[in-house]
């Protein structure tokens, strides 16, 4: 086996070639730039190994290896990603205090010898990673949206704290439109009542605002809110950002749902799994065949409980490892909430754990691991969810 280890960087990479059977370094570590010229240099030095049993290894971290991976796959190389935590622990285990690109490239090449440290990358994996970027972007925008909504409420608590006591739906179109025009109590109190009535009118049937102009102006006149122009500007700016981002979120939702219908994955057959949650989990998993069993998948999601035992001491109530993708864990917890609602098996399992004295969050974690076992079975056998076959 010929092992080609590459330590990836932003502007340059370091590569080396190792004969796994003898441990001989066939090509000493050399540097290549992160551009076409550098990629061609790597190919010219390693193309002699394409038709032999070989592996090209890189750490699965960052995004600097994506272009190089695509290039190598086009050239018919066998590419593998190595767990960066494993290389870090191996370096410490060997007592290597020095760290540089050359030593890292050699270490990566050596670690290709052990299957437990790497996963194979194919063209399909790259295509899946592109969809994963879409689902991650969706969740990132949702998180930013929640943060900006909290910022908006903070600002309103200063300039018009009574606003949320009114009977309108918070963050609705009427709510956002009105506040973008009148961001403070002082701006409302001085406005003509007829103009306020017009501002509260919304287009479309069944969307009339329940708040009256008289009601809101009376509150504004007696408001304890401060008249601060900088906060007024902050309110209008945040509302504009929220509205723009909402359009982007809706567009991504549509794209994800279209892809979900096109893919028609068995994961959507699970009661309570939405297109968004299902596709997020699926995008993070990638190729199910890279996992030998459900334990590997649970560990990949960071849902495996930590264990600490030494001699007679055995730590209890240990948390989950939280290794791997936080997006996958978030989607799992969101999905398991509705799955427990619509699936009798999961509902009974959740109730069982609660009756055992488990907290709500702990019981959810047990259900999430059970959900991962079900997902593994459905994806590996390409079968639909059947309530009668779930134990």
What are these regions (language model features)?
Residues 1-391:
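A detector of single, family-specific signature residues
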């Amino acid at each position: 086996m010929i092992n080609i280890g590459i330590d990836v960087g932003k502007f340059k990479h370091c590569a080396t070639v190792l004969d796994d059977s003898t441990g001989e370094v066939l090509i000493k570590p050399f540097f290549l730039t992160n551009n076409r010229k550098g990629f061609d240099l790597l190919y010219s030095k390693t193309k002699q190994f394409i038709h032999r049993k070989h592996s090209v290894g890189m750490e699965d971290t960052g995004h600097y290896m994506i272009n190089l991976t695509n290039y190598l796959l086009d050239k018919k190389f066998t590419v593998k990603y190595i767990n960066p935590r494993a290389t870090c622990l191996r370096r410490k285990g060997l007592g290597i205090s020095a760290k540089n690109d050359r030593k890292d490239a050699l270490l990566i090449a050596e670690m290709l010898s052990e299957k437990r440290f790497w996963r194979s990358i194919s063209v399909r994996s790259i295509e899946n990673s592109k969809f994963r970027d879409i689902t991650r972007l969706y969740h990132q925008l949702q998180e930013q949206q929640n943060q900006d909504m909290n910022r908006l409420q903070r600002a309103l608590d200063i300039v018009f704290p009574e606003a949320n006591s009114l009977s309108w739906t918070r963050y609705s179109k009427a709510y956002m439109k009105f506040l973008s025009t009148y961001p403070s109590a002082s701006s409302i109190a001085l406005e003509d009542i007829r103009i306020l009535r017009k501002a509260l009118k919304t287009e479309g049937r069944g969307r009339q605002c329940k708040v009256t102009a008289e009601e809101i102006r009376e509150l504004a006149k007696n408001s304890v809110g401060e008249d601060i122009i900088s906060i007024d500007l902050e309110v209008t700016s945040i509302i504009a950002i929220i509205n723009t981002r909402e359009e982007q979120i809706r567009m991504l939702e549509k794209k994800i749902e279209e892809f979900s219908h096109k893919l028609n994955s068995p994961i959507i057959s699970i009661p309570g799994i939405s297109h968004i949650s299902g596709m997020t989990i699926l995008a993070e998993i990638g190729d199910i065949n890279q996992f030998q069993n459900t334990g590997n998948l649970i560990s990949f999601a960071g849902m495996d409980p930590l264990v600490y035992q030494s001699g007679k001491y055995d730590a209890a109530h240990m948390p989950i490892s939280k290794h791997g993708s936080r997006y996958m864990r978030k989607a799992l917890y969101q999905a398991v909430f509705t799955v427990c609602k619509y699936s009798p098996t999961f509902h009974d399992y959740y109730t069982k754990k609660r009756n055992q004295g488990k907290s709500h969050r702990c019981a959810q974690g047990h259900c999430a691991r059970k959900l991962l076992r079900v997902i593994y079975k459905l994806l590996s056998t390409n079968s639909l969810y059947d309530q009668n076959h779930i134990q």
